[in-house]
């Protein structure tokens, strides 16, 4: 599925994958609901990560591609 993701695509975070990740263990594991309930836009991509901007007044966030799903 990561191959389908490109700049400008609308995505949302996958709760189960994000909560069980190494990133969640390294910091506060209480993620805000907008990550899962709203759509975000991919601003930039690397091999493993995407920079996602959610349409709330917060900074953009880097998430692993396997922690994202395309929004419908």
UniProtKB/Swiss-Prot annotation:
Q: What is its main location?
A: membrane
Q: Which UniProt keywords apply?
A: Membrane, NAD, NADP, Plastoquinone, Quinone, Thylakoid, Translocase, Transport
> Which reaction does this enzyme catalyse, per its entry?
a plastoquinone + NADH + (n+1) H(+)(in) = a plastoquinol + NAD(+) + n H(+)(out); a plastoquinone + NADPH + (n+1) H(+)(in) = a plastoquinol + NADP(+) + n H(+)(out)
Where is the protein found, in the record's own terms? Cellular thylakoid membrane
Q: Name one GO cellular component term.
A: plasma membrane-derived thylakoid membrane
The membrane topology of this protein is: Peripheral membrane protein
Per the UniProt record, which EC number(s) apply here? 7.1.1.-
Recorded hits in Pfam families, A to Z, give:
NdhO
A GO molecular function annotation here is: oxidoreductase activity, acting on NAD(P)H, quinone or similar compound as acceptor
Alphabetical list of HAMAP family matching this protein? NDH1_NDH1O
Subunit details: NDH-1 can be composed of about 15 different subunits; different subcomplexes with different compositions have been identified which probably have different functions.
The free-text function statement in the UniProt record for this protein reads:
NDH-1 shuttles electrons from an unknown electron donor, via FMN and iron-sulfur (Fe-S) centers, to quinones in the respiratory and/or the photosynthetic chain. The immediate electron acceptor for the enzyme in this species is believed to be plastoquinone. Couples the redox reaction to proton translocation, and thus conserves the redox energy in a proton gradient. Cyanobacterial NDH-1 also plays a role in inorganic carbon-concentration.
Q: Which family does it belong to?
A: Belongs to the complex I NdhO subunit family.
Q: What is this protein called?
A: NAD(P)H-quinone oxidoreductase subunit O
Task: Report the source organism.
Answer: Rippkaea orientalis (strain PCC 8801 / RF-1) (Cyanothece sp. (strain PCC 8801))
This chain is encoded by the gene named ndhO
